[in-house]
């Protein structure tokens, strides 16, 4: 439990930008979002095409 708590703390601190040298989280998060949206749209379109066929 202690290890999980420590990992959560470090993860949140990194995400909030407390340790910016380790990982710039906001930039990676903003870059990742459009890709996920496009993938979701492609999946929805593929499913709709399968249903129409």
Swiss-Prot record:
The entry's keywords: Differentiation, Membrane, Mitochondrion, Mitochondrion outer membrane, Spermatogenesis, Transmembrane, Transmembrane helix
TM region positions: 7-23
One GO CC annotation: mitochondrial outer membrane
Alphabetical GO biological process terms: cell differentiation; sperm mitochondrial sheath assembly; spermatogenesis
Cytoplasmic compartment spans: 24-53
Membrane side Mitochondrial intermembrane: residue ranges: 1-6
Top-level lineage group: Eukaryota
Transmembrane keyword on record: yes
Note: Isoform Kastor and isoform Polluks are conserved only in mammals.
Protein name: Mitochondrial sheath formation-associated protein
Species of provenance: Mus musculus (Mouse)
Source lineage: Eukaryota, Metazoa, Chordata, Craniata, Vertebrata
């Amino acid at each position: 439990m202690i290890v999980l708590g420590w990992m959560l703390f470090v993860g949140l601190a990194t995400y909030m930008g407390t340790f910016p040298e380790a990982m710039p989280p906001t930039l990676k998060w903003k870059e990742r979002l459009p890709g996920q949206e496009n993938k979701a749209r492609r999946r929805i379109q593929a499913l709709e095409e399968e249903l129409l066929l």
